[in-house]
Amino acid sequence: MNNIIILKKYAFSYLSKYNTSKKNLDRILHNKVRRMKLNKKDKYTLYSSIASIITGLEINKLIDDKNFTQSKIHSLSLQGKSKISIISYFVQKGIEKNLIEESFENLELKNPNWEKESAKIFARKKRLGIKYSANFEKDLAKMARAGFSYNLSKKILES
């Protein structure tokens, strides 16, 4: 029982520092239990209590995957990330595909040119384009590796 309280406190302290998804918090709590020096029986009881801890946090609105995806999409697009790299980030964090698509649709309605702006930010941060570099193919390859389409990359690098 005491270990469950410790695990709840760890979840609260983690959530006070970071905004995260349910699946990611589940992974973090599993890792915490794995690192604890307990016998197998106690670890199994803690593993089974993780789901109830997460549902309690979700009921109290401390974890919200929809809010997490919308805020992360906004911040990652301002960092110069492409749609493909943002989707791979969310898949890694365990966000459902339909929630990702819904969040992208909301972003497209608010700002239809967000990916173009994000590509401009990426090119500026990496010093790509005619102003900085004479090697167009290398710059184009760097944009492609970042997940931007060929046509969009070509437009950004030529301007």
What are these model-predicted stretches?
Residues 1-159:
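An alpha-helical, amphipathic repeat domain used for nucleic-acid recognition
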